Design a protein with these regions (language model features):
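Structured segments of extracytoplasmic/periplasmic soluble domains
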Residues: 112, 129, 133, 154, ...
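Short, hydrophobic alpha-helical packing/hinge segments within bilobed ligand-binding/sensory domains
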Residues: 52-55, 148-155
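Active-site glycine-rich loop that binds ribose-phosphate moieties when present
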Residues: 136, 143-152, 165-174
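Periplasmic-binding protein-like
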Residues: 12, 89-99, 174-212, 245
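A structural preference for short, hydrophobic beta-strand core positions in alpha/beta folds
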Residues: 32, 141-143
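Secondary-structure end/capping motifs
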Residues: 198-255
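Short, glycine-/small- and polar/acidic-enriched structural segments
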Residues: 1-136, 161-167, 180-181
Length: 255
């Protein structure tokens, strides 16, 4: 029987469960695979209009994949896996600009291209947040800067005027002095790929639930795991002791 394939999703829970041995304690025979740091971030440099939904179309390999709940719903309805409805998560996110940017308020983003992941949480959450300030024709989105870590690099390099970030890149931008103009926190759903044993799925999420409790109690013990998914070239700049817990799993039905 094939091993249960686990890929972390830029969050802490999978790393904590791995460190504490929770997956093995639940009886999972699994393989743990990381793809962002391993590719130097290139996996997120997908080009224009290639985001979470397109990655589902291409075929993600892990048995459990995560994306914003909008994208997971659409992917499942189009035959790209199925949605797991016993858990969801909430990811703090925001639109960041340089410290010296003339953009001070959300209204100042009128006509400014905001870098987001195409058909991803950052895409929909940006529109949702800015609708309170701007007319539809004033909201400008840039899909060409790629997915999460690729967008982060554009912000740091000064080649993108405004970027939507979440998870580790969110905290890294804060640490480096970039300003958050508006919050864009969004929900994340879970997609099941292939036909994993239902008991393996239950074991996997039981392990993550234990990890979530650990993070809730002492997040500062685990924020160093963000480094495991950052390209090595950023490590010397990172002070993860200042970072927060990020995405939080909610073990309630998604309806």
């Amino acid at each position: 029987m094939a091993k249960f394939l686990i890929e972390p999703h830029f969050r802490l829970q999978e790393w904590v469960a791995e460190e504490k041995g929770y997956f093995r304690a639940e009886g999972l025979a699994y393989e743990f695979r990381e793809l962002v740091r391993a590719t130097g971030g290139k996996i997120h440099a997908k080009g224009d209009k290639v985001g979470a939904f397109q990655s589902f179309e291409e075929g993600r390999k892990s048995n459990v994949s995560c994306a914003c709940h909008w994208t997971v719903n659409v992917a499942a309805s189009n035959g790209h896996g199925r949605m797991y409805t016993d858990v969801y998560s909430v990811a703090p996110a925001g639109i960041f600009v340089a410290a010296d940017s003339k953009i001070k308020t959300p209204a100042d983003l009128a006509g400014v291209p905001v870098s987001v992941g195409y058909q991803s949480g950052s895409h929909y959450a940006t529109v949702q947040a800015l609708e309170a300030y701007l007319k539809p024709d004033e909201i400008k989105l840039n899909y060409a800067d790629g997915m999460l870590f690729a967008r982060m690099e554009k912000l740091i390099d000064g080649t993108a005027p405004a970027v939507n970030l979440f998870s580790g890149p969110y905290y890294f931008a804060e640490q480096l002095g970039f300003r958050k103009v508006i919050d864009t926190t969004f929900m994340i759903g879970t997609r099941i790929h292939g036909n994993p044993d239902p008991e393996d799925l239950r074991n996997f999420f039981r392990a993550l639930r234990k990890a979530q409790r650990d993070i809730d109690l002492r997040p500062e013990l685990y924020t160093h795991y963000y480094k495991n998914e950052f390209p090595d070239r950023f490590h010397a700049l990172m002070d993860t002791r200042r970072w927060g817990p990020g995405e939080r799993l909610v073990f309630e039905p998604y309806t």
